[in-house]
Structures are given as structure tokens and as C-alpha cells.
Regions:
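Extended, highly charged
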Residues: 8-13, 25-309, 313-324, 328-640
């Protein structure tokens, strides 16, 4: 039956590579990927997959291949000959936003229309033909129990699973596309209270028993933490299932920031076009259509060292104590394929997740936080370090002199809302003319720089929580935040070249224009607290220099040429390597009624500090090995 279905699927897809026209009538049939093999065959038939039959090592080599193929705009990759492993592996399934749309081409428009109806219920009776498929889509959102599933076809040992290691200093092998499922200990049979998240899983290394234990790294503001707390309060183990593969909708749902009342399983059902089936048992609910499942229990009071791991900020997440699972079962489908991704300094494949998430959630934002029209977590800056927002300024519309008022209320609401609360820098403005494009990052920043008053518009949050993966702060999860809120008319022109009379103190040199109004300068290596005097010398030197009104922002860094080479370079180093409360300074500092401000320019010390995590660097031998592959002239070589 599966062969017949697959043959029919191939005939349907033959020659069809473009996503369905979003304006066309909804199709009755929806592509329902039930396994990674279904996904692979779908991509193959759309000329979006290459197959690598040569042996490839999952220890660093496979990850380097994936990074290169993604950056060169390549297709998905199926590795059929994995060294030391009997399972094929697949990567780059989300190779681009276009490919992600292709995977969900029969359901994405339905999800959009479902969102439209949720935002405006009156749209349904007004346009019944447009929303004719909404009731059926709503039915697919109800997860259901089943007694068994395809994932239970075979058992294997934990050590037989693919041992993917992505970066040289990683503490072992990791699952990089995990679907971590936990049941609410207070309602274990209620699928609407199951949490699905993508929390990294360490399969081997450190002190883990390679056959019986896996590490679980979940951070602050993660749903599984609520279940962990409940299990701890009840003095019982937390039931957890880690699944890999199945419908790609499960992977997207695991990272989707969803509003209250909408669970990951309901969203996955809508996006996959079928109800999510979960296996009922004495264990946590298990996704029945997954390719692999690791099932077990977590002692809520016990931890083990987890990491290091090369993460999406472009640095290593260091070793820290985290929970671990005692493994009871390892299951896999017949003909299972292990999907994986590789994270590192953006852009990587998870960039596509962010793009699709923005596309789906942008219309929802105004309903979540009143007055906020749009938000953009900047991928190039590592996502959480920099958040841009467009709000509204309506408190005193009759006043000619404009200053941020309602924007500050909205900024506080943003920093108190779910995943948005992890933002370290929040730049917010209003847009009464609807002329600002929030995804045009350079233009957005320049819009604020033309209006900002550094004496008034800086609002620090000190000694607070920040993203677990951000090592710019004073400790794990500890640091500060800075809101930059600006409104009104432009008050300055921005320099389009280095001011001719610019003078710098000894040890600080090589000024480079990053973009209009922003300069990067090279400073001495940061060696300790004494190095903070470099910033004081710089501010004192600039105190009485004329011609700096058009340069409101200066970044002090280790390599100003690198910082100015691309906007992405500047975004990455400026916002990942600075802790606002410590590393933000300026010319003409004043503190009035405990409010810190400066005349300007504002200076951000984005030099590498001794407490920062090391950046991700490829292994030279592996790089040479992959370089050699690039000379073979095969289908893969052109992307290497």
C-alpha cells in the first residue's frame, strides 16, 4: 500500500516544483508527509535533493558539507553511506524559504486563512468561499491517541543512532532536530497539555552512559520547564519522549512562538494537513509517525554536565549542569532516515525557520500586544540579542513636540511577553505613515538614529535575565537589557563618510564607516577591568571634537575592517559581544533622577572579553577534506 501511495505521489509531483498559487482554489488533497522518507521523495521529485552515496563521516565532515551547501543555496542532501552507522541521514530539508513553502505548499495557505479568521471572525460569513476549508483545517488541529505507530516497528541501542558532531569543541554527538515531548504531570492523558519543544539533546560524551542516558538542554522561557516544576512538586519523574523525523510540520511547530491557547501539536496538525497521532502508554505520549523515538524519564532533581555545543549565536554554549533522561526505549521506523541540521553563526538552516515564522506570525503581533504593529528578531545578530519593533505613539497627539511615551509602555509589554522577553537590545519607533520596513534592518536603524536623543531615549534594565546562550552578561542567564525608543521628526543628517577632522586617542585607530551614521573603530585587546579605561579615554578625547553630530553611534571592536565589511558582521559582533549596562557608554554622560543619558555619540564596547564563549571555527583537516571533495566534479561538488 505504501508503495502504491508513493508511486501515486510521484506521478502527482512529476515536473511540479513551484508552490501552489496562493490565490487559487484550495485543493481537496493535501500532501501529508508521514516520514522523512516521504519528505525526501517529495524533494527528489521536485529536483530539490541530491544524493551522496560516498561514505561521509558524521564527525565534523557531514556538518561542514551541510554548512557549505546551505550558504551556496544548495538543495537538500541525502547521505546514504554514513560512517559507523546503519541509518541514512538527511540535511538541508529547509534549504530556503522557497523550499520551506514547497514542503507545505498544500497547507500553508490554509493555515494563513485560519489565522485570518482568528484575527477577524467576521471574515468567515463575509467571504464563505475563501474560507470554505477553514472548518476542515480546524479539525486537523485536534491531536489524537493511538495504540501503536510506525515508529515502533524496530528497536535499537542508543549507541546505534547517528553520532553527529558539528564543531570541534562539541562535548559529544547531538540531536539537532529533536522534537522533545513532555506530558503535564497533572494531566498526563490530556494531549492539549503536551509540550513540544526543540531542546538540544546530547547523545554521547561527558559522563553520560552511552546506552542509557542522554542530556537535555532546556533554557529559561521554555514550556518543558513548567512540566519539570510540576513533576518536582509532585516528587515524581518527568515522562519525556524525544522524537526525530516524521512530518516537517513537527519541527517547525517545535520552535513556533504560539499564543496562549494554541499548542504545538494543534499547529503541527494544521500545517501537516492531518491530526497528529500520539501513542498512548505508560510512557510520555510518543509521536506515532516519527522516524525515531527515544523514550524515558527525567529525575527533576538530578543534573549532569552538558555541552559544550556550537550554537546559533556563532559561539560555543559552554558546559553547564542540565537535566538528563534515563532511556527506557529506542524505536525507529522501517527504512528510517535521520534528519539533522547544523547551527552556527547566522545565516544557517535555522534562518529559514525564522523567516517562515515571521511570515506566519507577523499578522498576529498587533493582536498580542496592543499598539505594536510589527517585531523583527534579527537573525544576523543571533536572534535574541537584537529585536526591532514598530509601535504606536497616540498618548498626546495634539502636542507638536514628540517624545516617546506610549512606545515605552509597549516596550515593557514586549519585554514581558514570552520569547520576546529574551531580547537584549530593543529598538522601537512608531510609523504613522506606514513607511518603515522592519525587515530592512539598515534603514530601520538609520531611521532611529536620525531621531534619537541619547539624553532621553535610553532605558536600561539592569541585573535581569537574558538568553541562556548569551555569554556577554555577568553569569549564566544574567545580564542587562537596553531599550532605545525614538519618535518624532528627524533631528540630524547621518554622515556618509568618516568626518575629515576625526581624531582618535592612542591605541584606538582605523575608523571605518559601517553605514550612514555608524562608525567602527579598532581598540586594544580587552584583558580585564583595566581595559574599560579605553572607553573612557575615547569619550574624553571626543568630548570637544566638532563634526560628530552626524555620527550618533560608534562601535569599539577588535577589527573595524571586519565590522564594516558587511552589515551582518556589524550586527553580529556589536550585539552579541556587549552587555548594555557595562559596555554602553557615551560622550557627555549625564545622570538625572537616576536616568542615564549622554550627548553622544553613543559608544558600544563590542570587543571580545575574557568571559565570552569562544567563537566557532572549523577544523582545518576536515576543511581540507571537504575541499578535496569539491574537486570531484559530481553533483555535490558544485556546492562545496
Amino acid at each position: 500500500m505504501a508503495a502504491i501511495r508513493r508511486s501515486w505521489l510521484q506521478q502527482r509531483l512529476k515536473g511540479s516544483r513551484e508552490p501552489l498559487d496562493s490565490g487559487s482554489r484550495q485543493k481537496v488533497f493535501a500532501l501529508k508527509h508521514r516520514s522523512t522518507r516521504d519528505v525526501v521523495e517529495d524533494l527528489r521529485n521536485g529536483d530539490r535533493l541530491i544524493t551522496v552515496d560516498d561514505e561521509v563521516d558524521p564527525n565534523l565532515e557531514m556538518a561542514e558539507i551541510q554548512r557549505r551547501v546551505y550558504l551556496r543555496g544548495g538543495p537538500a542532501i541525502l547521505f546514504t553511506n554514513v560512517r559507523g552507522c546503519k541509518f541514512p541521514m538527511a540535511s538541508n530539508l529547509f534549504a530556503s524559504l522557497d523550499q520551506a513553502r514547497y514542503l507545505f505548499r498544500d497547507t500553508l495557505e490554509r493555515v494563513r486563512r485560519l489565522i485570518e479568521v482568528k484575527l477577524d471572525p467576521s471574515a468567515l460569513p463575509k467571504s464563505p468561499m475563501r474560507y470554505a476549508g477553514v472548518p476542515m483545517t480546524a479539525l486537523t488541529m485536534l491531536p489524537r491517541f493511538t495504540r501503536s505507530g510506525a515508529v515502533q516497528a524496530n528497536q535499537c541501542r542508543l549507541s546505534e543512532l547517528p553520532a553527529l558532531k558539528s564543531w570541534p569543541m562539541d562535548g559529544g554527538s547531538f540531536v539537532t532536530l529533536p522534537q522533545v515531548l513532555s506530558a503535564d504531570p497533572e494531566a498526563s492523558s490530556n494531549l492539549m497539555r503536551v509540550n513540544l519543544g526543540m531542546y538540544r539533546v546530547q547523545l554521547a560524551g561527558n559522563e553520560y552512559d552511552p546506552e542509557n542516558q542522554v542530556g537535555l538542554h532546556y533554557q529559561i522561557h521554555r514550556g518543558i520547564g513548567v512540566h519539570h516544576r510540576a513533576a518536582m512538586d509532585r516528587n515524581e519523574s518527568l515522562q519525556v519522549a524525544i522524537t526525530v523525523g516524521g512530518s516537517p510540520a513537527m519541527s517547525l511547530a517545535a520552535v513556533m512562538p504560539l499564543p496562549e491557547g494554541l499548542t504545538e501539536l494543534t499547529f503541527a496538525g494544521a500545517l501537516s494537513g492531518r491530526r497528529v497521532r500520539m501513542i498512548r502508554g505508560s510512557h510520555a505520549p510518543v509521536y506515532a509517525d516519527a522516524d525515531f523515538a527515544i523514550v524515558g524519564q527525567v529525575d527533576p532533581t538530578a543534573t549532569m554536565p552538558e555541552g559544550p555545543f556550537g550554537d546559533h549565536l556563532g559561539y560555543y554554549s559552554l558546559q553547564h549542569p542540565f537535566p538528563f533522561m534515563k532511556v527506557e526505549h529506542v524505536w525507529h521506523r522501517k527504512d528510517a532516515i535521520w534528519p539533522f541540521t547544523v547551527v552556527g553563526r547566522p545565516p544557517q538552516e535555522d534562518t529559514t525557520f525564522g523567516q517562515l515564522i515571521h511570515e506566519l506570525t507577523d499578522p498576529i503581533i498587533p493582536t498580542v500586544i496592543p499598539g505594536v504593529k510589527a517585531v523583527h528578531a534579527v537573525d544576523a545578530a543571533g536572534v535574541h540579542p537584537l529585536l526591532l519593533a514598530i509601535g504606536s505613539e497616540r498618548y498626546m497627539p495634539y502636542l507638536k513636540a514628540k517624545e516617546p511615551q506610549e512606545l515605552l509602555t509597549q516596550a515593557n509589554a514586549i519585554l514581558g511577553n514570552g520569547q520576546l522577553s529574551l531580547a537584549k537590545y530593543l529598538w522601537i519607533t512608531d510609523d504613522p505613515d506606514d513607511s518603515i520596513r522592519i525587515h530592512d534592518i539598515g534603514s530601520f536603524i538609520q531611521h532611529i538614529l536620525r531621531r534619537v536623543d541619547w539624553r532621553r531615549d535610553l532605558h536600561f534594565h539592569t541585573k535581569t535575565t537574558i538568553d541562556t546562550l548569551d555569554y556577554s552578561g555577568t553569569g549564566l542567564n544574567q545580564g542587562s537589557k537596553l531599550v532605545v525608543a525614538a519618535t518624532g521628526q528627524s533631528t540630524r543628517e547621518l554622515a556618509t563618510e568618516i568626518p575629515s577632522g576625526l581624531s582618535l586617542p592612542d591605541g584606538i585607530s582605523d575608523p571605518q564607516l559601517v553605514m550612514p551614521g555608524v562608525i567602527a573603530v579598532k581598540g586594544p585587546k580587552f584583558t580585564g577591568d583595566a581595559s574599560r579605561e579605553d572607553v573612557q579615554r575615547l569619550t574624553a578625547h571626543l568630548e570637544h571634537q566638532p563634526g560628530l553630530e552626524s555620527v550618533p553611534l560608534i562601535t569599539l571592536c577588535n577589527d573595524s575592517e571586519f565590522a564594516a565589511a558587511t552589515l551582518n558582521n556589524w550586527l553580529w559582533l556589536t550585539f552579541t559581544r556587549s552587555n548594555p549596562a557595562i559596555d554602553v557608554d557615551g560622550v557627555g554622560v549625564q545622570v538625572v533622577a537616576k536616568h542615564w543619558g549622554c550627548r553622544g555619540p553613543l559608544i558600544i564596547d563590542a570587543r571580545v572579553k575574557p568571559h565570552h564563549a569562544p567563537p566557532l571555527v572549523e577544523d582545518a583537516e576536515v576543511t581540507a577534506k571537504v575541499d578535496a571533495r569539491a574537486t570531484r566534479g559530481d553533483e555535490l561538488a558544485k556546492y562545496l
